[in-house]
């Protein structure tokens, strides 16, 4: 197993595409960022995901949260009232890209991305009060966010939800009281 850092996983993906033998001895493990770069037509991409066959998928989840001085748990009403709602965006072609769509669908008109902030940098800006909304995947949510929730400094807003094989969306067991995005969408839009 070899990780090749840099380029939003494009470097490593391109290297695998160029050097891997199609004999079943190579496995291409990729993140959402790898897929988003294909979907957005990034000219640096030299790999063709349609030529690969999925063998295992790992369900991941996104947890959205804010500071307790900005909102009540699971309630976007105060966030939606703000004229400016800042959030971190690693790059325009990162996995965070779908957050723009999520915030639009939830009617957060003041949502504005701050590009160039890594997950860690964005979270530090959030803790300093420079960013209003933040999100993390499961591992960082458990390690970094849950302790802040327990201290009363941070509140859950929602999770993306876990998509079942039948297409149903269930709540994340790491935050069972937090609504899923479909639940929040229905709450906000009826």
Each predicted region: which residue ranges?
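C-terminal lobe and pocket-closing loops
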Residues: 145-190
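Short, conserved clusters of charged catalytic residues that mark active-site
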Residues: 11, 47, 140
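Solvent-exposed loop/turn segments at secondary-structure junctions
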Residues: 7-8, 32-36, 61-62, 70-71, ...
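Paired acidic/hydrophobic, glycine-rich loop segments that form the ligand-binding mouth/hinge
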Residues: 23-30, 131-138, 155-158
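Early extracytoplasmic/lumenal segment of secretory-pathway proteins
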Residues: 1-14
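Hinge/capping helix and adjacent helix->loop/strand transition within the periplasmic-binding protein
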Residues: 15-26, 38-133, 181-190
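Structural signature of the Rossmann-like NAD(P)-dependent dehydrogenase/reductase core
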Residues: 3, 29, 85-88, 158-161
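Short, hydrophobic alpha-helical packing/hinge segments within bilobed ligand-binding/sensory domains
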Residues: 10-13, 122-123, 145
């Amino acid at each position: 197993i070899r990780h090749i850092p840099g380029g939003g996983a494009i470097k490593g993906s391109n290297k695998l595409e160029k050097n891997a033998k199609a004999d079943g001895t190579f496995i291409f493990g990729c993140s959402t960022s790898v897929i988003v770069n294909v979907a957005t037509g990034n000219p640096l991409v030299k790999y063709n995901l349609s030529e690969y066959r999925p063998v295992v998928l790992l369900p991941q989840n996104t947890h959205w949260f804010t500071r307790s001085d900005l909102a009540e748990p699971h309630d976007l009403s105060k966030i939606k009232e703000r004229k400016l709602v800042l959030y971190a965006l690693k790059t325009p072609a990162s996995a965070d890209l779908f957050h723009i769509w999520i915030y639009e669908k939830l009617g957060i008109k003041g949502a504005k991305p701050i590009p160039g902030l890594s997950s860690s940098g964005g979270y530090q800006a959030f803790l300093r009060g420079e960013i209003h909304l933040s999100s993390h995947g499961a591992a960082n949510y458990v390690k970094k966010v849950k302790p802040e929730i327990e201290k009363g400094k941070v509140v859950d807003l929602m999770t993306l939800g876990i998509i079942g094989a039948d297409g149903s969306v269930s709540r994340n067991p790491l935050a069972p009281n937090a609504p899923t995005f479909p639940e929040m969408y229905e709450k906000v839009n009826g």
